[in-house]
Amino acid sequence: VIGHLCSSSTEPASDIYEEEGVLMITAASTSPTITEKGYQTIFRTIGLDSMQGPFAARYVINTIKPKNMAIIHDKQQYGEGLATAVKNVVEEAGIKPVMFEGVTAGDKDFSALIAKLKRNNVDFVYYGGYHPELGLILRQSREKGFSAKFMGPEGVGNADISKIAGEASEGLLVTLPQSFDQDPANQALVAAFKEKNEDPTGPFVFPAYSAVQVMTESMKATGKSDPEALAAHLRSTSFDTTTGKLEFDAKGDLKDFSFVVYDWHADGTKSP
C-alpha cells in the first residue's frame, strides 16, 4: 500500500497493516509516533515532524528573531506535534512564545484569535496544521489589520491556500521538501505528469513516486511480493530515486531528509 496522507489516518491504519502483514509506505505522514511501535511493515519516504519542527525553529531563531512570537495549532496529531517541536526548540534558545494555543479544525471565524494576537503585540506566528484553517486566518488577519509574519509546514504549502487567503498569502513562510520537480533528472517525469494534467509541484508528489520506486525495486530484487522479505530488503538497501538516494533505518524512517524554507506567493507559486 502507498498511503496515507494524514498522520491521524496513517497511525490507526498502520495497526491493521502490521496485524495483517501488509507492507505500507507513506509519502506524506510525518508524525514520529507512526514508526515508534516497532512495526516491521511500516515505512515512509518523507521526513519527520521531529526533523521539520526543529528545522523551522532554527530558522525562526536565526533569521526571524521575533520579539513576540505566537504558536498556533489545530489540536491534531500533525499540527500540534509540529507546534510543540517548534516551541521546545525556540524556548531552548531563549524565545518564550507569548501564546501557544489551539484552534478547532473546521472553524471558519477566527476573529477572537486574531484579537488576542493583536492584544499580545504578536509580530510572528508559527502555525501547525493544514491550509484550510491557516488560509482563513491569513485572510481574516489582513481584513482586521493584523500584519504579523506567518510560517507553516508542508501541510499549508499548496495552491489552495492562495485560493482561500488571496493576497494575504503573499510572503507566508513554508517549510517544504525541496522542489524535486525542478531537478533536471526529473524533467521527463514532470512532462509525463503534465501530459496527464497532473500537478507535479505538490510536496508529496515525488516522495510518493519514490515510494512506488522502492517498493517495485524490492519486488524485482527479491523476486517476491512477501511483505517480510520486502521489508528486510528495504532496510538493507540503498535506493536511487526521484528524490535522491534513500536509505531506511530500523524503524522504517529515512536516514536523511532535507527541508527548505520557501516564500509563498499569492499566485500559488513559491521561491526559496
Language model features with spans:
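Extracytosolic ligand-binding ectodomains
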Residues: 1-272
